[in-house]
């Protein structure tokens, strides 16, 4: 009896393995990746606009790169340029107001591995200047985040102070 069951089971499995697999048809139309990215950028812009409105950031202006800047304190002297070594202080927040960190750093503008948005914000600042900058995710840590405190695709707020410019 055991041999007969084994043969029947083996024969059944052999027949089933010969059948063509049924095709699974995805009924949802796939969105074009470019269109999906445009939708994400529009959603992120709404998040930034809501942050500006809820925090009453009067006077904050777009800078032409998709970032928003508000001068808090004017600096003095020459503006920082590409090639200058600058010392700056930054306090970084997610747009839910949770703090990411506060630090002081020295970078050579145009040659350092910092976020594109941070670089753009530092260029043109003067010694002693304080600036609030809202940076979209694509100019911050992008689709990966920083693998620590900044989640993927997160716009950031930077409160910057330029301490020193070395030419």
Which residues does each PLM region occupy?
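Sec-dependent bacterial lipoprotein signal peptides
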Residues: 1-18
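Cross-family detector of peptidyl-prolyl cis-trans isomerase
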Residues: 18-167
């Amino acid at each position: 009896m055991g041999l007969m069951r084994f043969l029947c089971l083996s024969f059944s499995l052999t027949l089933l393995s010969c059948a063509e697999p049924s095709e699974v048809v995805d009924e949802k139309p796939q969105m074009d990746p470019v269109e999906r990215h445009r939708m994400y950028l529009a959603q992120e812009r709404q998040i930034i606009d809501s942050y500006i409105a809820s925090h009453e950031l009067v006077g904050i202006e777009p800078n032409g790169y998709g970032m928003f800047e508000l001068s808090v304190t004017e600096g003095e002297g020459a503006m920082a340029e590409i090639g200058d070594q600058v010392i700056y202080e930054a306090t970084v927040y997610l747009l839910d107001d949770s703090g990411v960190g506060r630090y002081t750093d020295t970078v050579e503008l145009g040659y350092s591995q910092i976020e594109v948005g941070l670089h753009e914000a530092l260029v043109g600042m003067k010694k002693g200047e304080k600036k609030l900058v809202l940076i979209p995710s694509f100019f911050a840590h992008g689709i990966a985040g920083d693998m620590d405190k900044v989640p993927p695709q997160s716009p950031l707020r930077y409160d910057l102070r330029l301490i020193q410019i070395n030419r």
